[in-house]
């Protein structure tokens, strides 16, 4: 074979051989982009570990669940000024724990939720304890506030809450389940609620009445009431 033929064969093999792909070297920009994506992933994982804002709001939700809240009435108030009318809202709110504690609050704000929140905070500041015997009240009582007059009477178990809207809201927050009531005066919800609160504040424990009069409890309260008091103290 001649020298020229050998050169032709070498050139043909070089052309027929497949070209191998070589990976291009990573540029500086590509390396920076990958590092940034890695940092973002780490930050996202960190947020997931913190758990978001659920931990902070959990305490507020737990506090709300401890109390019974009733919005009795919401009123819109308008004030005429030079530029027109300005509207605000008032909310009458009753808050209780369902176990003898209750309070009434009156909130004012430019928005309804803010007015309700202010009313709830004011109601919690005015908590007072209501004497109870089982699921009813110890004795008949009447409360007054402005032109509102509310009468409350104890009832036997299974009677239920016989009351109108404003009175019912207060009694449900207290935790009274058997009672008779009647509104004798104004039909204004604010007056009725405050009259109901006044009536509840007039209630007295049978033991306190017996101590004030210097008499035994059996002579002050009927036998059924004394038995209910003993069961209540025993936790039955």
UniProtKB/Swiss-Prot annotation:
Gene Ontology biological process terms in this record: translation
Region (Disordered): 1-64
Gene Ontology cellular component list: small ribosomal subunit
Domain S5 DRBM: 67-130
Origin superkingdom: Bacteria
Assembly and oligomerization: Part of the 30S ribosomal subunit. Contacts proteins S4 and S8.
HAMAP family: Ribosomal_uS5_B (MF_01307_B)
Function of the molecule: With S4 and S12 plays an important role in translational accuracy.
UniProt name for this protein: Small ribosomal subunit protein uS5
Gene name of the record: rpsE
């Amino acid at each position: 074979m001649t020298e020229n033929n050998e050169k032709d064969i070498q050139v043909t093999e070089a052309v027929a051989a497949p070209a191998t792909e070589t990976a291009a070297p990573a540029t500086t920009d590509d390396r920076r982009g990958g590092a940034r994506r890695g940092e973002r992933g780490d930050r996202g994982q960190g947020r997931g570990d913190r758990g978001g804002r659920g931990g902070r709001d959990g305490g507020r939700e737990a506090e709300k669940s401890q109390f019974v809240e009733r919005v009795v009435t919401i009123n819109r108030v308008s004030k005429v000024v030079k530029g027109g009318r300005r509207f605000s809202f008032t909310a009458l709110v009753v808050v209780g724990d369902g176990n003898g504690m209750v309070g009434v609050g009156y909130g004012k704000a430019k928005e309804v939720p803010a007015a309700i929140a202010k009313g709830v905070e004011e109601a919690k500041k005015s908590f007072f304890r209501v004497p109870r015997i089982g699921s009813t009240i110890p004795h008949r009582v009447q409360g007054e506030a402005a032109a509102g007059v509310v009468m409350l009477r104890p009832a036997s178990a299974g009677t239920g809450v016989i009351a109108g809207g404003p009175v019912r809201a207060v009694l449900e927050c207290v935790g009274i389940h058997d009672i008779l009531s009647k509104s004798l005066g104004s039909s204004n919800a604010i007056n009725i609620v405050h009259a109901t609160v006044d009536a509840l504040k007039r209630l007295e424990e049978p033991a306190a009445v017996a101590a004030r009069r210097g008499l035994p409890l059996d002579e002050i309260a009927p036998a059924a009431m004394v038995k209910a008091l003993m069961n209540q103290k025993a936790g039955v």
